[in-house]
């Protein structure tokens, strides 16, 4: 194990020695200039770990119940689909990725990665109220997930 680049990683590692979080959710923006399909939608990146994709789909059903309408079932990228092909799936098992690393730390917890657009969802320009509404949707989905699991 090498020296961590970011202080946040040390803090998370210290936390996992005391607490056992039930979930890791990596939320970040997709690359700019990629295909519109991926650049302007909210989606989960399908994981290859045994049972992970089924868990992600279950979480997706909870998030899709949100009121913002920003996340839609069917927008997720399944393992093996498009750019999430064999090279990406191999990388998902890599402990240098957030989800790969988390599975080495707490393999029994739920892990997922979300790509969210920078400013536009489909043809809609997003503003502060949209982001707050999406945050409420995510919070409600997490709560429902934790209650159920």
PLM regions: where:
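Active-site/substrate-binding loop(s) of hydrolase catalytic cores
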Residues: 1-73, 77-96, 103, 113-115
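Generic surface-pattern signal
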Residues: 64-68, 107, 143, 147
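Short glycine/proline-enriched loop/turn "hinge" motifs that connect secondary-structure elements
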Residues: 102-108
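Short helix/strand-capping connector loops at secondary-structure junctions
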Residues: 111-125
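His/Asp/Glu-rich mid-to-C-terminal helical/loop segments that flank catalytic regions of hydrolases
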Residues: 121-149
């Amino acid at each position: 194990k090498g020296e961590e680049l970011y202080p946040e990683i040390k803090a998370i590692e210290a936390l996992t020695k005391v607490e056992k979080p039930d979930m890791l959710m990596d939320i970040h923006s997709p690359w700019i200039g990629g295909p519109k399909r991926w650049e302007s939608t909210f989606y989960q990146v399908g994981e290859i770990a045994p049972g992970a994709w089924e868990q992600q789909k279950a979480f997706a059903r909870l998030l899709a119940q949100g009121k913002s309408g920003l996340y839609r079932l069917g927008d997720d990228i399944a393992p093996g689909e498009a750019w999430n092909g064999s090279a990406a799936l191999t990388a998902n098992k890599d402990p240098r990725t957030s989800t790969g690393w988390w599975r080495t730390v707490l393999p029994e917890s739920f892990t997922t990665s979300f790509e969210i657009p920078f400013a536009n969802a489909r043809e809609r320009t997003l503003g502060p109220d949209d982001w707050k509404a999406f945050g409420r949707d995510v919070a409600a989905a997490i709560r429902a997930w934790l209650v159920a699991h």
